[in-house]
């Protein structure tokens, strides 16, 4: 397994932009191995100094995220990674969790992450579900998405506030009246 990670470090370190190769390899490895092997591989990959290999590991975590310990690790540890690319993959991994669980059934976890002290954790939700109203459940219940996102409009983190603005702008393309109503309720200073 260590040799495999070393080969990934060599291969992935040449990738400067994007995440498709890491995502594709993680999915292939997830599908072709049992969960225990994939889990060990993910944790070993996440220890890599090569951020692209950590990205690969986080994609694996997303596929394995129905396991509570994996979801907790994503929330509490991956969210502390200092590489912004790894944070982007955390958002994708969280969306993978929600997709696997079912968006409506994932609401308690979504709400928990939105209240987390770490801004990277909160942002993983807003970015992970960026096109919220294209997702099952939220497509039929757009106000559920809008209310949750709008609750972060005054977040202490500019990083999160910018994400909130971007997500609301995306939602306004499908539901302009709902966003207009929401924005009309804001007290702007």
PLM regions: where:
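Alpha-helical scaffold domains
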Residues: 1-189
């Amino acid at each position: 397994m260590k040799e495999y990670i070393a080969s990934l470090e060599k291969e992935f370190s040449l990738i400067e932009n994007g995440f498709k190769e890491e995502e594709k390899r993680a999915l292939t490895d997830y599908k072709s191995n049992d969960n225990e092997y994939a889990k060990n591989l993910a944790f070993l990959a996440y220890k890599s100094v090569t951020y692209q290999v950590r990205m690969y590991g986080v994609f694996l975590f997303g596929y394995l995220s129905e396991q509570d310990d994996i979801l907790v690790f994503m929330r509490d540890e991956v969210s502390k990674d200092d590489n912004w690319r790894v944070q982007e993959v955390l958002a994708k991994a969280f969306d993978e969790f929600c997709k696997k669980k079912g968006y409506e059934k994932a609401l308690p976890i979504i709400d928990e992450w939105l209240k987390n002290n770490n801004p990277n954790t909160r942002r993983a939700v807003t970015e992970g579900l960026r096109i919220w109203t294209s997702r099952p459940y939220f497509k039929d219940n757009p106000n559920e998405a809008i209310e949750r996102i709008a609750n972060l409009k005054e977040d202490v983190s500019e990083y999160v506030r910018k994400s909130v603005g971007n997500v609301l702008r995306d939602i306004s393309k499908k539901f302009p009246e709902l966003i207009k109503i929401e924005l009309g309720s804001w007290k702007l200073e």
